Structure formats: structure tokens, C-alpha cells
């Protein structure tokens, strides 16, 4: 009854914490072995330091009842005990059927023991560790459930020889995850188990057949400096209306922000223009109003006036009024102060009706070639305007003009023509020479006669 209670205590203690290793080189002592020594010494489980386990181990009841074998050796030389697999027909500890070897631990010698695992704890045994090596997390449950540990005593003890380790580890590799390399050719070679500090951490994912401690270390290193994801604050800054600007006109204030085909922001005016016409709006940047403080104290540097339609600058960069600026530009000298006026003089433009009358008068000056029909018609008009007493000379004058045009070489006809013209002018009875000139200009045949 006592061994079964002790095994239950060992299983409970093995699931609580990792193994405690002995400081002596060449071996280690599991916490389960320490708890077993404490259970044998007292009825209640009391923690016993690992340095005392070597002297208390020969007094364990289940080791004394087991058959002894030639496992005693000196200086770490001798045959290494076997690490059998767990089987259902293996007898429990204390039954006398196990193959456990024991020896008294003395100075310079080490004793090792192994036993079959009981069917009550079907866990795979844990292989021996090298000097100063740590154990992987998967090995604690196996060692705490039913694995046998080796005990070393004295200062010069080492691990046993590696005679039958190769074929035993090959059978263990099928049931255990390949977290390390089990094949060692010398006991001074370090183990490939990943070292740990403090309590072992259970991996978040199940161990695969190709996972190694190097891979886990690379994953832990790569996962440590994780890049900080972009928070929503950066997106919020882009959505703020103060940070937006129209890509077309550069406006930063609009009642409604729109987007073009490429996703850029447009103000309401440019967005509507682009939507309706399919083109970008005219690049009219909003004119910023000049502050009133700049306009209030502004005065002309030449005449010191404060009212002008356009402010200009002189060669020195000083503000001048429009009149002084134009005067300096045209004449090259400053505008005299005597020319200063209180009001603003605007340009006097002529009405458009005068221009039209000038165009009509210019067209009337053009001479029109006279034909016989036009001459007769004009002569008839003139005869109508004359009095009845002068009607006959007027008709004679018309005939003389026709004859004069046809026979210009005859001097008599020319004299008759001029005499007829004199009679014509007398019959019209014009008052002043100005009136005569105006009447001549109105009739085309009179202009030809004066030529």
C-alpha cells in the first residue's frame, strides 16, 4: 500500500514544477526522486534538499526490495543501465520483478538504478541528460510519471558509458517529439536541448516533427521586435478638414469636400465643375483679402494722398498713387505737387455719335464718275429747284455741259459752258460762298465741274 501512495504523491509533485538538478558534475537528481526520499522518511511529503538524496537513496524500500545488479562502478566507467519503454505487463516498484540496479554511493563512485514503469503511469521514460544541460518542457511529464533517474555521489562521479544508448534512443524517438538530438558519441558533448531560465513555458502550438530549438529561438527573436501597427490616429488626421486642400485651386475651405477620379480631394466648386463638364475647373485660387491695417495707414510717398484707384510702387519700393506712378513712368521725373488734385480725375471719353458722323462725312468726299443719265437726272433736279424765268437757260446750260464733255477741244464750247454755269448759279440765288460750297459738295456733277 505504501508504494502506491508514494507514486501518487510523485505524480502530483511532478506536475507542479520543473526538475531540480544536482550541482555535482556528471549527473542530476529529479525532483520526483527527492520527493520519494521525503515520502519514505516521513508520512507527510516534506521537501528534502537534493544534496541529501544520495545518502538517503539506499534506504528507499522499493529499491531494497528490487533485485540488485552489477551496476556499481568507479569514475563513471562501466555499463550504462537500460531505459526501457513503458509496457502494460511491467510490474510496479517494490514487487521484486524489476531490473533495478543499486549500489552504495561512496567517494569517487556513482550508483545508478532503473526500473520498469508501472502500468498505472503509462508515460514514456526520459533519457539521461548531459552535464550541465537543461531539459525541454516535454520531458517533465515523462520523467515525473514513471521515469527512473540516476543518482551520483561524490565529487568525481560522471555519467555511465554510452554502450547501449544508440538503439535505446532510436525507440524513444518514435514516441517523443524531436526537440533535440539524442545521439551523442561522447559524454562530454553538450546536449541540444534548449536551455531555459525559470519555469518552463508551454508552447502555444503542438510540436511538429521538424521543429528544432533553433527554429523556436528564431521565431522568438523574430516575434520580439514586432512592428507597431498603424493606429487609427493617422487616419483621423487625414480626415480632418484642416488638413485637406483642393488639388485644383488650392482652397482649404469649402462647404463640401469631393473627390476626383484618382481619389484626390476637390472643393465643392471644382468637384461640380469636373462632374458636369468632365474637365478640371479653371485654376482660380481664392484671393486672400488684404488686411484693413495695410490699407488704413497707406499713403503716397510723393503727394501723400490716401485715395487712389490703384496703388503702385516706385523704384525704391515705396507705395505711390496711380497718378504719381504713371507720371514717373512716362516722364522719368517725380510728379510735381502743384498737379495734385483733391478728387480723382477720370478719363473723358468722346460719345460714339460723333464717331459715326465722321465716318459718314469721309465717305461723301469720294468722287463718283458722272454718266449721261446721272447728269441729266441731276440737271433735271436742279431745274426743278430754279424759278420759271431761269428754266430755259438752265436747260441750255445742261446741253452745253454735255457738249463740253463730248468736245473738250473746242474753246467756244468751253466758254459757253462757263457762261451757262454762271447763269445757273445766278438763277439759284445762293446767299453766301459757304452755302455755295455746301451745295456743290452735295451734288456729284458740281464737284466734277469745279475740278
From Swiss-Prot:
Annotated Basic residues bias: 346-355
Top-level taxon in the UniProt lineage: Eukaryota
Mapped zinc finger ranges (GATA-type): 246-270, 300-324
Post-translational modification Phosphoserine, affected residues: 126
Compartment list: Nucleus
UniProt GO BP: cell fate commitment; epithelial cell differentiation; heart development; negative regulation of transcription by RNA polymerase II; positive regulation of DNA-templated transcription; positive regulation of transcription by RNA polymerase II
Keywords: Activator, DNA-binding, Isopeptide bond, Metal-binding, Nucleus, Phosphoprotein, Repeat, Transcription, Transcription regulation, Ubl conjugation, Zinc, Zinc-finger
GO molecular function: DNA-binding transcription factor activity, RNA polymerase II-specific; RNA polymerase II cis-regulatory region sequence-specific DNA binding; zinc ion binding
Biased segments, Gly residues type: 94-109
InterPro entries: GATA_N, TF_GATA_4/5/6, Transcription_factor_GATA, Znf_GATA, Znf_NHR/GATA
Cellular component GO terms, alphabetical: nucleus
Region (Disordered): 69-111, 338-416
Bias-annotated ranges (Polar residues): 356-394, 402-413
Covalent link (Glycyl lysine isopeptide (Lys-Gly) (interchain with G-Cter in SUMO2)) residue numbers: 285, 329, 340
Pfam families: GATA, GATA-N
PANTHER family according to UniProt: TRANSCRIPTION FACTOR GATA FAMILY MEMBER, TRANSCRIPTION FACTOR GATA-6
Function text: Transcriptional activator that regulates SEMA3C and PLXNA2. May regulate genes that protect epithelial cells from bacterial infection. Involved in gene regulation specifically in the gastric epithelium. Involved in bone morphogenetic protein (BMP)-mediated cardiac-specific gene expression. Binds to BMP response element (BMPRE) DNA sequences within cardiac activating regions.
Complex and partners: Interacts with LMCD1.
Free-text note regarding domains: The GATA-type zinc fingers mediate interaction with LMCD1.
Protein name, as recorded: Transcription factor GATA-6
Organism classification: Eukaryota, Metazoa, Chordata, Craniata, Vertebrata
Gene label: GATA6
Amino acid at each position: 500500500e505504501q508504494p502506491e501512495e508514494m507514486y501518487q504523491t510523485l505524480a502530483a509533485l511532478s506536475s507542479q514544477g520543473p526538475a531540480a538538478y544536482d550541482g555535482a558534475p556528471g549527473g542530476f537528481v529529479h525532483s520526483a526522486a527527492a520527493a520519494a526520499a521525503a515520502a519514505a522518511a516521513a508520512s507527510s511529503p516534506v521537501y528534502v534538499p537534493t544534496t541529501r538524496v544520495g545518502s538517503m537513496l539506499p534506504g528507499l524500500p522499493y529499491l531494497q526490495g528490487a533485485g540488485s545488479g552489477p551496476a556499481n562502478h568507479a569514475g563513471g566507467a562501466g555499463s550504462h543501465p537500460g531505459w526501457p519503454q513503458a509496457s502494460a505487463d511491467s510490474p510496479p516498484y517494490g514487487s521484486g520483478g524489476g531490473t533495478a540496479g543499486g549500489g552504495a554511493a561512496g567517494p569517487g563512485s556513482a550508483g545508478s538504478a532503473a526500473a520498469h514503469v508501472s502500468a498505472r503511469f503509462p508515460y514514456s521514460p526520459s533519457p539521461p541528460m548531459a552535464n550541465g544541460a537543461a531539459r525541454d518542457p516535454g520531458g517533465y511529464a515523462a520523467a515525473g510519471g514513471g521515469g527512473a533517474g540516476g543518482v551520483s555521489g561524490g565529487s568525481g562521479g560522471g555519467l555511465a558509458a554510452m554502450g547501449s544508448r544508440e538503439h535505446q534512443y532510436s525507440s524513444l524517438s518514435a514516441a517523443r517529439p524531436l526537440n533535440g538530438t539524442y545521439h551523442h558519441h561522447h559524454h562530454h558533448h553538450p546536449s541540444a536541448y534548449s536551455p531555459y531560465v525559470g519555469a518552463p513555458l508551454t508552447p502555444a502550438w503542438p510540436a511538429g516533427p521538424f521543429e528544432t530549438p533553433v527554429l523556436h529561438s528564431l521565431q522568438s527573436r523574430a516575434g520580439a521586435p514586432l512592428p507597431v501597427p498603424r493606429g487609427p490616429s493617422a487616419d483621423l488626421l487625414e480626415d480632418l478638414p484642416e488638413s485637406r486642400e483642393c488639388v485644383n485651386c488650392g482652397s482649404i475651405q469649402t462647404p463640401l469636400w469631393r473627390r476626383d477620379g484618382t481619389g484626390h480631394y476637390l472643393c465643392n466648386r471644382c468637384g461640380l465643375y469636373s462632374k458636369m463638364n468632365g474637365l478640371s475647373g479653371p485654376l482660380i485660387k481664392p484671393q486672400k483679402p488684404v488686411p484693413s491695417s495695410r490699407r488704413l495707414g497707406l499713403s503716397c510717398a510723393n503727394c501723400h494722398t490716401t485715395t487712389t484707384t490703384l496703388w503702385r510702387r516706385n523704384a525704391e519700393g515705396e507705395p505711390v498713387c496711380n497718378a504719381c506712378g504713371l507720371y514717373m513712368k512716362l516722364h522719368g521725373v517725380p510728379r510735381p505737387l502743384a498737379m495734385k488734385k483733391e478728387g480723382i480725375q477720370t478719363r473723358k471719353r468722346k460719345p460714339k455719335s460723333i464717331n459715326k458722323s465722321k465716318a459718314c462725312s469721309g465717305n461723301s468726299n469720294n468722287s463718283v464718275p458722272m454718266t449721261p443719265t446721272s447728269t441729266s437726272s441731276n440737271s433735271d433736279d436742279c431745274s426743278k429747284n430754279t424759278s420759271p424765268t431761269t428754266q430755259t437757260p438752265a436747260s441750255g446750260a445742261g446741253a452745253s455741259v454735255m457738249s463740253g464733255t463730248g468736245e473738250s477741244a473746242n474753246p467756244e464750247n468751253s466758254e459757253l459752258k462757263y457762261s451757262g454755269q454762271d447763269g445757273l448759279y445766278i438763277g439759284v440765288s445762293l446767299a453766301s460762298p459757304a452755302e455755295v460750297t455746301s451745295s456743290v459738295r452735295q451734288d456729284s456733277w458740281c464737284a466734277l465741274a469745279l475740278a
